Every structure is written in C-alpha cells, then in structure tokens.
Amino acid sequence: MNSAIMQGAAMATSHGIARLNRHNAQRNHFHIPTANRLFYQLQTPCTSTEEERRTVQTDDVAEIGMQRPDYQMYCGEEEISEQFVKLNVGGQRFMLRKDTIRRRGVGRLLDLINKPVADSNADAFFSSTSEFYFERPPSLFHIVYQFYLNGVIHQPSNLCPVDIIEELEYWRIIPDQYLASCCCAQQIDDDDEEVEEQDKPNLFKTLRFGEIRRCVWNIIEEPASSGKAQAFAVCSVVFVLISISGLVLGSLPELQVATKQRNNLTGEEFTEMEPMPILGYIEYVCIVWFTMEYGLKMLVSAERSKTFRQLLNIIDLLAILPFIIEMLLLIFGISTEQLRDLKGAFLVIRILRVLRVIRVLKLGRYSSGLQMFGKTLKASFRQLGMMAMVVMTGVIFFSTLVYFLEKDEPASKFHSIPAACWWCIVTMTTVGYGDLTPVTVPGKLVATGAIACGVLVLALPITIIVDNFMKVAETERPAGGNRYRTSQYPKATKSEQMILKVT
C-alpha cells in the first residue's frame, strides 16, 4: 500500500515537473531550439506600451522595438508564405521576411515579392516548397543576404572583387551608398595613389611638350610600360652595380696606388693610398649617368616639387651629392687637395664620399621585395618605436646597475656608464662580443636579467612585424591584377573601384 502511494506521488511529481518545464519553455525562448527560435520570436504577441516593445527580444531578421502583428503560437504554411520569401540559391536555402526586403527598397528581391509567381524573375519556382530558385553561387549571395539584414555591403577577403561586382549587378544593388566603411577605409591611400596615377596623363596634356615629357617620364619611372623603359631600367641597375663594385674594390690594397707622403696628428709620416685611376674613371662615368637620370627626371616631371620630395628621388640626389659639391668647389677654384689640411672640411669631404654607398638603395626602385620591406617598416613604425623605447629604458637601467657594481673591481673595464651602455646593448641584443664582461656575482646576476629582458623585448615585436609583412604582401600580390580589372570597368563608380582594390 505504501509503495503504491509513493509510486503515485513520484508519478505526480514527474508530471508536474514536465508541465513546469513546458511552461518555462513557453515563457523563456532560451530553452527553445535554435532552429525554432525565430518563429517563437515572431509569435511574441504585440505589447501594449512602448516600454514593453523595447524589451521584446528579436534577432537580426526583425528590428528591435518594431511592433508586430499578433501571431498564433505556431505559424502554418499559409502564414509563412504571406510573411516570408523562400529562396534557393545554388542549392542552399535562404529565407527573408518580406518587410525586411521592402525596408531596403532596392534589388531584384523587391521585384520578386511585388510580382506574381508567374511573372517572377527567378530561374525556377518549386511549388512543393514554395521556393524561388536562382542559379547563382551561394557564397556570393551571402553578401546580398547580409545587405538586406544590415543595410551595408561587406566584402569577405576570400572572394574575388570582380565576382562581387557582377553579383551585385545581378541582384540590382549599386554599392555607391551601401559599401561599409570598414571595407574601404584601409584602401583610401591606395585609391588616392591610383587616382593620381590615372590623372598623370591629364597633367602632362596641359604642359608644354606634354606628350614628349610623358613618354620620357614613363621610360624613367615606369619600367613595365614599354621595352624602352625596361632597357633603361636594366641600364640603371647595371650602373648601380658597377658603382658599388668600384667602391668595394677600391678599398683593396692590391687595387690602390701611393699618392704622396703625409703627416698624421702625431707628426709621423705615412703614405696616402688612393684607388687606381681606372676605378676613378669608372666612377665618373657612373656619376654622369646618375646625374643625367636625375636631371632628366626633374626636367620632364609634371610636379617638380612633389617629385623632389619623394623618398627614392631624395636617395638619387644623395647618391650624386658628393660629385655635385666637388664640381661646385672646382668652379670656385677650390680643389679637394687644398681642403685636406683643414680638419673639419676634410671630414666633410670624407662623409660625402661615404654617401656613395647610398646608391645601393637605388635598387629599391626596381625591386618589389625592397619596396615591400620598406612598406613593412613603415607599417611597423609604432611597434619599432615602442621596442626602441623599451630597449633604451632597459639599457639605461642595467648599465647603471652594472657600473656601480663593477667600477670598484681592479680588473673591471666598466669605467663609465656610457661604456656600460655599450656592454648592455651588446648583451640585450644577444650579440655578446666579450670585450666587456662583469666579474662580480651581483654583476653577473644583472647581466642575466639583461639577457632575459633583451630576449623578451626583441621577440615580442617580431610577430607584429611579420604580420605587417604578410598584410603588405597580401595587398601587393593582386595589385597588378586589380589594375587590369579596373581597366575593364571604365565606368566603375568610386565604391566599385574600392571593392576592386580591397582584397
């Protein structure tokens, strides 16, 4: 008897718990499966006040706070057909509320819901499932679907920009007013550069001898524009390599000749050595080519002030600056031999001669790899500045510690904090020349801390720099293809040109 009573109570309790769970599921949509959650949200009855309407939870398809008509607990097929449009795009099913499509007010889908099924612009209509079939790629339709939900057009990085343009044209959506700012803000600078490149022919048209100047400019600045431009670029690279080779070979004792006897600061005589005359002649030939190249570029340029300020042109000027100064001194009757007795002037002359090594940077004009490296450093300028600041702080901190710990030791070489700074830089960069080493136990502990901090400080920005390099490489990779594709869309709008450049 007691067991029967207990069993009945347990059954009653289980039935009560089940009823309570069903009741909670009706009140709280979080217990409803995800697939049915949309229908449950649309089944939420119309609330009476604005305060209650704001608290109605809806998802992306339905706007928050928007008043809904009363729905039954479960929508039937007839109600779904009246409120929704079913799409089958390339075998993948989509569903949108008709109110959402009307709210955007544009596109092929707007015509689809406003016309009868017989007059629809779909490729087919499946009467069994009430689906409109479109023989289009579903991966591209996701962009259109997101546009109807959010009102903006985003571009995934894994899709071809030309395909996106064609897909938007098919769905009769013009991206002028709907392109998301996040998808074009990064490319503003690149777009400005492209506009400038497209406007250069127009700039030359307004100048005297504009056509001739434009042809010469393309030969000098656009190596890929013609065969003459490629030949000119090859000659420039050859002259750069010859000039650098002459500078390097001129330092070999076997290729040097004695000029005259001179006295050093202590009064001792020494024989001054100079490179062989043949190397000097080669240097003059290279200088003539570089000067001709730079002068011709400035002569035919449509915007000389802007051309003068460009980095690569500044490098070209520095490469010929020693020769220009030497020629100016000769014009005024001053030779470099007369300046050798003046300590400061002779130092300036030597510094100007050292500037010849800058010519190796001229190769960056014809090397896409060097250009990518320069853009990577420019993109990583903030991270490099942060690393330099942290390294400088660590150098000052550890060098001061090791100086005061080591300066009183008889065998110590840490005679000053600047000397300790040199040791700290070598240590933190894990180079370790070994010319300065701590001898005390506290000094060695400080050295251990400097090594550990150096590894951490130098390792952290590396990942950021590599990431920036990958981004630069990714943007540079399709640059030529985008330029070609844009030329096939001469009437493309500004937004379409941005889409063509985003990947």
UniProtKB/Swiss-Prot annotation:
Keyword Metal-binding: no
Glycan-modified residues: 264
Membrane topology: Multi-pass membrane protein
InterPro entries (UniProt xref): Ion_trans_dom, K_chnl_volt-dep_Kv, K_chnl_volt-dep_Kv5/Kv9, SKP1/BTB/POZ_sf, T1-type_BTB, VG_K_chnl, Volt_channel_dom_sf
Ranges in the topological domain labelled Cytoplasmic: 1-231, 297-313, 367-383, 467-503
Cellular component annotations (GO), alphabetically ordered: axon; dendrite; membrane; perikaryon; voltage-gated potassium channel complex
Pfam families: BTB_2, Ion_trans
UniProt effect for mutating residue 219 to A: Disrupts dendritic localization
Tissue specificity comment: Expressed in the cholinergic motor neuron DA9, mechanosensory neurons ALM and PLM, and the interneuron PVPL.
Compartment list: Cell membrane; Perikaryon; Cell projection, Axon; Cell projection, Dendrite
SUPFAM superfamilies: POZ domain, Voltage-gated potassium channels
Primary location: membrane
Sequence ranges on the Extracellular membrane side: 253-275, 335-346, 405-417, 435-445
GO terms, biological process: action potential; long-term memory; potassium ion transmembrane transport; protein homooligomerization
Placement of sequence motif Selectivity filter: 430-435
Region (S4-S5 linker): 368-383
Intramembrane runs of residues: 418-429, 430-434
Membrane-spanning residues: 232-252, 276-296, 314-334, 347-366, 384-404, 446-466
Self-association state and partner proteins as the record states: Homotetramer or heterotetramer. Interacts with unc-101 (via N-terminus); which targets kvs-4 to dendrites.
Family matches, as PANTHER family: POTASSIUM VOLTAGE-GATED CHANNEL PROTEIN SHAB, VOLTAGE-GATED POTASSIUM CHANNEL
Known role: Voltage-gated potassium channel that mediates transmembrane potassium transport in excitable membranes.
Similarity-based family: Belongs to the potassium channel family. B (Shab) (TC 1.A.1.2) subfamily. Kv2.2/KCNB2 sub-subfamily.
Name of the featured protein: Probable voltage-gated potassium channel subunit kvs-4
Species for this entry: Caenorhabditis elegans
Name of the encoding gene: kvs-4
